[in-house]
Amino acid sequence: MKPYCMISNAKTFAFSAENPTGARAGGSKGGDCTKLSPTVAIRAGETVTLVDTDGPGMIQSIWFTGYVGHSFVIRMYWDNCEYPSVEAPISAFFGTAYDENFVDRDGKYAVLNSAQILVAPGRGLNCYWEMPFKKHCRITMENRGEKDQSLYYIITGCHCEVPDEIGYFHASYRQEHPVQKGRSYTIIDGIQGKGQFVGVTLATGMNGNNTCWVEGEARMYIDDDKYPSIHYTGTEDYFCGSYGFGNDVQIKSYQTYSGLYSGMYAIYGDNRAFYNGQQRFLLYRFHVADPIHFETGFRMTLDNMGWTGPRYDDYTSCAYWYQTLPSAPLKPLLFKVFFTK
């Protein structure tokens, strides 16, 4: 029986610019049939609180639009922890890290059509990861840019009983521009606690020669592993593709795809259908059907390698997992101009 057909005592809430407290009957007062306050203005250097509510409960869906570029940083705090369990540029959190500064941007984002994250045309960002909490939930947005910006949002959830054994949602951003040649890129490390790894979104930017770039192997280290317990033979294989993401091995052309839990859904750059230099790719893999369980910790790396050996491409990622609290502090954000091509 699916949860949505079961009657319960849960109480729905929704935080938005029209109802910033999330209170019952708290939205659009005095503004029937009009828009009173559809956006929240976030000044340069300012952090605003989008959600602040006591538990127990669960965040069930998140929607953003407006300015949703990489200068906005989203953070989530569970059960009054002093440091965030989620910290990432908003565009990278939603798997669309190449959001600006490339020549073929036309104001729209490529469509990401998965079960956990949906990126709709026109920059509609949607998240469906369930995020339970026992005592408290706080979600903030920081504007690290030089200009004031506006954000549309609605964050929906419910106050309800949650089991003692819940895992708390976490997400961490990483980037290396470029990856050090001959060394693996780290998707995530430093996790301490019991939980399960549930996926990653990845943006890659090609540097140098125009040969295949997907020979790098994905490795997962569970608890105190010296060598990986899970080992994928290539980058495209980890993202559930094969043979260089190709649809024609003879002419070496790419084929995008977007499924419930995995995809290589967008390519940016000249001659984007063919193996070429200076292209950029957006990928995702969500371990909803096959979560990777760990008792004390978890680490994942991805080689940057092509047919001709190690490469030095630009990698950007956001990893997602659930775990017990308290968790280790996330690695600090490297904040610079994230994407310059």
Regions found by a protein language model. Name each.
Residues 1-341:
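Beta-strand-centric surfaces of beta-sandwich/beta-rich domains
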